[in-house]
Design a protein with these regions (language model features):
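Active-site-proximal inter-transmembrane loops
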Residues: 126-147
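Membrane-anchoring alpha-helices and their flanking helix-loop junctions
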Residues: 1-132, 153-211
Length: 211
């Protein structure tokens, strides 16, 4: 196992990074909000999220920060959970898994931040009819970088911590099902342009052209 202090530092750093990105995402959406989005939100009350959906979103998006930072604090103080036999997950080559988890985190978090900025600026700040087909940054190569980031971050935290506390993050793997629900709506919205975009890009991994 990697030293508990190092694991705690990495958990705290990545947990705070995730949380700050969520806050920044909301800020970017508000900062770049178009006048038409503001007008539509005042007129359309049916599509406003309910308090229940807001609560679910808060739990889902807040869990990585709460669990990672909480476990990091435990590691800095008494290690009642981080190194405890009843909570640690014993695996062979544990250091290798933890290093892999760190690599996945530092791949997933920048991807998540980039996706949050781009969607906050160009997508969620506008009403659906005014949203461009986003093809900037990672969207040039894959269609769902944020969902890929969800899964990378979930695996990263679990492997880095090797602790039962982080296992609830497996819920983030449900992101793999979201594109199947969303892409038919995107085809309706963008038509042939989105179909052409599908041919050029992969859902989660880039497509490599031959020749």
């Amino acid at each position: 196992m990697l030293p508990a202090v190092l694991v705690s530092v990495l958990l705290a750093t990545c947990g705070v990074w995730w949380g700050l990105t969520i806050i920044a995402w909301i800020t970017w959406e508000k900062r770049f909000e178009s006048p038409t989005k503001s007008a539509d939100s005042l007129q359309d009350t049916e599509k406003k999220p309910t308090w229940k959906s807001k609560l679910v979103d808060a739990i889902e998006f807040g869990a990585p920060t709460v669990l990672a930072v909480g476990l990091a604090v435990d590691g800095f103080t008494g290690r009642a959970l981080l190194s405890a036999a009843g909570w640690s997950i014993p695996v062979p080559f544990s250091e290798g898994f933890q290093i892999l988890g760190t690599v996945l985190l530092f791949a997933g978090l920048p991807l998540f931040t980039a996706g949050a900025y781009l969607t906050g600026r160009y997508v969620y700040s506008r009403p659906p009819t005014d949203r461009p087909l986003l093809q900037k940054g990672p969207y040039r190569f894959i269609r769902h970088p944020i969902y890929l980031a969800f899964m990378l971050v979930a695996v990263g935290f679990i492997l880095l911590a090797l602790n039962l506390v982080m296992l609830p993050l497996v819920y983030m793997f449900t992101a793999i099902t979201y594109p199947k629900q969303e892409e038919p709506e995107l085809i309706k919205l963008y038509g042939g342009a989105y179909r052409e975009y599908q041919q050029r890009t992969g859902r989660f991994l880039p497509k490599f052209r031959r020749g």
